[in-house]
Amino acid sequence: MTTRRTGLREQKKQATRVALREAALRLALKRGPDNVRVDDIAEAAGVSPRTYNNYFSSREQAIVAAVTAERESRVAASVAARPADVRLADALAEAILEQYTEPRDHDELLLITASPALRDTFLDTVAAIEHPLAAAIDQRLGHTGTPTARVLAASVAAAVRIALQQWLQPPAAPLTTSGLVVPSGSLPDLLRSALATLEPALDAAEEQAQQRLRQ
C-alpha cells in the first residue's frame, strides 16, 4: 500500500510539474516572457505561487523546461537502447543528435533566441543530462564501479553545451533591432565536432570494459 501511495504521489507531482511548465510556455508565447509573472503561471496551472516555487526557481526555468520536455531522460534512454555492438562514441553521438536536432516549433525557438535570460537558462539545462547519461554509460561499460562513466557523462554534457553556445551565441552573431540572436552554422555539425574530441577517451573506456570481460 505504501508503494502505491508513493507512486500516486510521484504521478501527482509530475502532473503538477507538467501543468506548470506548459502554462509558462503558453503564457510566454502569448504575452512575451518579460510580461509573465510567476503568479500568472501558478494561477494558470491552478496552484499557489508557493507550490510553483517547489518546482521551479524562475519563470525562465519553467519556460525552458516546457521546450526541452524531459530531454535528459530521452537522451539516456536513447543511448541505452542502442545495440551492444554499436560503438559507445557512436551511440552517444546518435542519441545527442537525435534529441538536440529534432524539428522544433518555430515559435518556441524564436522565444528562446529572443531572450538572453532564456538562452542562458536553455544552456544551463544541458547539465541535467549528466546523471541519467552516466547511468546509461555505466551500463554499457558493464558497471565498472569507478568514476569513469560520471567523468565521461560530464565531458559529454560540456561538449554539448559548448556546441549549443556556439550555435546560439556566436562571437559575431547578427542581432535584430530587438536583440534577437540569429543562430548560425549547422547545429548537427557543431555537435559532431564537439563530441569528436571525446572519442579517444570513450574508445579507451570501452576497450578497457571489453578487456575485463575477456579476463
Region roles according to the model:
Residues 73, 103-132, 138:
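Short secondary-structure transition hinges
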Residues 135, 169-215:
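C-terminal peripheral helix-coil segments that are non-catalytic and often amphipathic
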Residues 1-31, 35-44, 74:
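Basic, helix-initiating cap at the start of DNA-binding domains
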Residues 93, 149-157, 161, 188:
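Short, well-structured alpha-helical segments
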